[in-house]
A protein has these predicted regions:
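Residues in the short beta-alpha loop(s) of Rossmann-like NAD(P)-binding domains
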Residues: 37
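Beta1/beta-strand and adjacent pyrophosphate-binding region of the FAD-binding site
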Residues: 2-16
């Protein structure tokens, strides 16, 4: 065991960092969370929690409170602009595999607030807001984290550091861990509107993907509104894409002119597919967006990050508590990086290509695949296992670097 002052420091108080903190505290391990902002983020960002993620949050005691603040989506639907609905899939078909057979639509800030409320006052938990990681150095038994707060630098020492500090991770950069991948040329425009798509499109699911060779779109229902996502061509400037004229023209592609279509909020963002070359370097780990980012089609980014966090803490906790050998930590990189590359990156890229396909053969293949899954219960179940991220979790659990020995 290290002589470091703290067992674990976590950089970042987003959903990934806070889930990691909660599970370590559950294992009676003291944790310090460093958050560069002055408070928890109130941005919506990710808003989908998949069935196995809800099961994990239930094990930590947070699921019921989160579910009460969100909207259950029992089905997911795939359509095409040419052929209409291709297939609707009910998560009830995998109710024997999960305790929560639905997607939950709830903004990620709701989870971080729930966790902070639960951990506040616990002597094992501390959080420092307005504290930005400036640099990280490590030896064979200690990690030194230099933090800037109120214009002053402070050095913290710990045995283990978890970098959950987002896509621009200072932890990752300080350890010279490459962030390999690419940025899509187009951006994604998200428009939030109170338009009732259930009335406009009877039978529409709360999660609905619509393939269109000209301009695909994605409908996501949240409490009191819908989010509509569409791509924005590379040649369109950010200023134009956020203009009232452009946003209005975009929403009018799917909402008739005779209906009011007020826009409550718009967001335009660049979309990346990147994965860190390593998820572990010595005593430093990466999780969530610090380790991998992807397009949001499929809702796999935050969920994958939470899966990272709990995979890691399930290993790190026993190591710190002396019931497991440090050798088990090597499995974290193998398990989570492998499924990130094969499943999360692969599936999100495939989702985008299916929706935007212009070649008739590619579009026909997508239509045929969805229709086949809708017509065959076993194929439908396989689709649900994949999109709910059950397959990636199972795949990760089967990977091991070597035999491990008790500590």
């Amino acid at each position: 065991m290290s002589n470091a002052k703290l067992p674990v420091i976590i950089a970042g108080a987003g959903p990934v960092g806070m889930v990691a903190a909660a599970d370590l505290v559950r294992q009676n391990i003291p944790v310090l969370v460093l958050e560069k902002n002055d408070a928890l983020s109130s941005e919506s960002r990710a808003s989908t929690f998949h069935p196995p993620t809800l099961d994990m949050l239930d094990d930590l005691g947070f699921a019921n409170t989160l579910i009460a603040q969100g909207l259950k989506a029992p089905t997911v639907q795939y359509s095409s602009s040419e052929d209409g609905v291709l297939g609707t899939f009910d998560f009830a078909a995998i109710s024997d595999l999960v305790r929560h057979p639905f997607r939950l639509q709830a903004e990620q800030f709701k989870l971080t607030r729930i966790i902070l409320d639960a951990l506040s006052g616990n002597p094992l938990f501390s959080i420092a807001f307005g504290s930005e990681v400036k640099s990280v150095e490590q030896t064979s038994d200690t990690v030194k984290v230099v933090v800037t707060a109120n214009g002053h630098d402070t050095t913290h020492e710990c045995a283990w550091l978890i970098g959950a500090d987002g896509a621009n991770s200072i932890v990752r950069r300080s350890q010279d861990m490459e962030f390999e991948g690419f940025t899509w040329p187009e951006r994604f425009l998200v428009m939030t509107t109170p338009v009732d798509f259930t009335a406009l499109r009877p039978g529409v699911s709360s999660v609905s993907y619509v393939a269109d060779p000209e301009r695909w779109y994605f409908l996501l229902r949240i409490l009191g509104a819908w989010r509509v996502m569409m791509p924005v061509a590379a040649e369109t400037s950010d200023e134009e894409a956020l203009s009232e004229a452009y946003v209005t023209a975009s929403i009018r592609r799917i909402v008739p002119a005779e209906l009011d279509a007020p826009i409550l909020h718009t967001t335009l963002y660049r979309v990346h597919q990147r994965v860190a070359a390593n998820f572990q370097k010595g005593r430093t780990f990466l999780a969530g967006d610090a380790a991998h980012i992807n397009n949001p089609l499929g809702g796999m980014g935050m969920n994958g990050g939470i899966h990272d966090a709990l995979n890691l803490t399930a290993k790190l906790g026993p190591v710190i508590n002396g019931t497991a050998d440090e050798s088990i930590l090597a499995d974290y990189d193998l398990q989570r990086r492998t499924v990130t590359m094969q499943a999360i990156q692969g599936d999100t890229i495939r989702n985008k290509k299916n929706l935007e396909a212009k070649d008739e053969a590619d579009r026909a293949r997508f239509r045929d695949d969805i229709r086949a899954a809708a017509a065959d219960s076993e194929k439908g179940r396989q689709l649900l296992r994949r999109i709910a991220m059950l397959d990636s979790l199972e795949r990760a659990g089967a990977l091991h670097v070597a035999e491990h020995h008790p500590g």
